[in-house]
């Protein structure tokens, strides 16, 4: 009966509770696939829970992460520290050089007042023979050449010690082979001859050359030192009846007696080391000689000046001139009488 009382032109869904807007809005918000989801169907069907949740904005405060680069003030501090260390190093070097110059000046003043006293070889005061030379690297030799001159001095000492050991090597060889008396005698002679002669003939000229920048002394050193190098090579070879425990003599002694042969081989190695070091130092001294400005012309001038300024040469020349003048006058007088 109510159907007949209703308005035929009214909306039929007006009184439908399922058509209410609030209900239809909720049903539209249901995730898709919820009605079609079947847990027993193919696993490739996405589950209803696979809906992406909306991104929640981060409410934490922004924090800046530190970078790997150091701040500018840190680099400036490091550069300042390096510059300060370099300045301190230079200052210490300058102070050391100033102290060295001050010490050398005081020593020169003492030498000018009291004179230079010989101090080499260092002998005791009660020894009957006194020192023959004056030697002080810090006073006589410039700083840039002191190391080279000291090495040459140590090389001379090394060769002297080798010659001294050579005496014992030849003595041991003579004990196992009585025909080696000549080698033992010559070994003593070489020690007594080469030790002082090498010091006077090539080391002292080298010392004086660097002390006074003398071209003439450099040439004397080069000439004598070449001969010294040849002697080192011959001693390392060790020919029979030459008084040297070289390689040839060592092999011969090794056939006679093994301990004696080993002793001689050690001495031969020392002679070989002397020859090699001599060659190396010769090249080094020659390189320094080329930087000093020395030349053969300067050596000739120094030789002529030294000869003419030598009192002994002057006296001999004056005596020769007076003798020649006297003989010429006598011959002229005799010629006039005739």
Curated annotation (Swiss-Prot):
Membrane disposition: Multi-pass membrane protein
Lumenal-side positions: 177-181, 239-261
Ranges that cross the membrane: 156-176, 182-202, 218-238, 262-282
Parts of the chain on the Cytoplasmic side: 2-155, 203-217, 283-338
Domain of life per record: Eukaryota
Cellular compartments annotated: Golgi apparatus, trans-Golgi network membrane; Recycling endosome membrane
GO cellular component: clathrin-coated vesicle; cytoplasmic vesicle membrane; membrane; recycling endosome membrane; synapse; synaptic vesicle membrane; terminal bouton; trans-Golgi network
Modification type Phosphoserine: residues: 2
InterPro entries the UniProt entry points to: SCAMP
Keyword annotations from UniProtKB, A to Z: Acetylation, Endosome, Golgi apparatus, Membrane, Phosphoprotein, Protein transport, Transmembrane, Transmembrane helix, Transport
BP term (GO), one: exocytosis
Broad class of where this protein is predominantly found: Golgi
Chain residue ranges for the region called Disordered: 1-64
Annotated protein name in UniProt: Secretory carrier-associated membrane protein 1
Organism: Rattus norvegicus
Taxonomy of the source species: Eukaryota, Metazoa, Chordata, Craniata, Vertebrata
């Amino acid at each position: 009966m109510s159907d007949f009382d209703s308005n035929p032109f009214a909306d039929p869904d007006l009184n439908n509770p399922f058509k209410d807007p609030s209900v239809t809005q909720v049903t539209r918000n249901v995730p898709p696939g919820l009605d079609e989801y079947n847990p027993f169907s193919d696993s490739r069907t996405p589950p209803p829970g696979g809906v992406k949740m909306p991104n929640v904005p981060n409410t934490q405060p922004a924090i800046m992460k530190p970078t790997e680069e150091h701040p500018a003030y840190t680099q400036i501090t490091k550069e300042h520290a390096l510059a300060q260390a370099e300045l301190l190093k230079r200052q210490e070097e300058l102070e050391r050089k100033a102290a060295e110059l001050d010490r050398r000046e005081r020593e020169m003043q003492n030498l000018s007042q009291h004179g230079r006293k010989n101090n080499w070889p260092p002998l005791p005061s009660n020894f009957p023979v006194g020192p023959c030379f004056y030697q002080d690297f810090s006073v006589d030799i410039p700083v840039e050449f002191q190391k080279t001159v000291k090495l040459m001095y140590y090389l001379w000492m090394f060769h002297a010690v080798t010659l001294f050991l050579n005496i014992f090597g030849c003595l041991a060889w003579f004990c196992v082979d009585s025909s080696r008396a000549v080698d033992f005698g010559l070994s003593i002679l070489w020690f007594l001859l080469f030790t002082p002669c090498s010091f006077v003939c090539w080391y002292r000229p080298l010392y004086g050359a660097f002390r006074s920048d003398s071209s003439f002394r450099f040439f004397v050193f080069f000439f004598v030192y070449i001969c010294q190098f040849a002697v080192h090579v011959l001693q390392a070879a060790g020919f029979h009846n030459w008084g040297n425990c070289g390689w040839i003599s060592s092999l011969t002694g090794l056939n006679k007696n093994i301990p004696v042969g080993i002793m001689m081989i050690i001495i031969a190695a020392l002679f070989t080391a002397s020859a090699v070091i001599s060659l190396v130092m010769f090249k080094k001294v020659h390189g320094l000689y080329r930087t000093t400005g020395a030349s053969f012309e300067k050596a000739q001038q120094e030789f002529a000046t030294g000869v003419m300024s030598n009192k002994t040469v002057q006296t001999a020349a004056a005596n020769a001139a007076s003798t020649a003048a006297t003989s010429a006058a006598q011959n002229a007088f005799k010629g006039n009488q005739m």
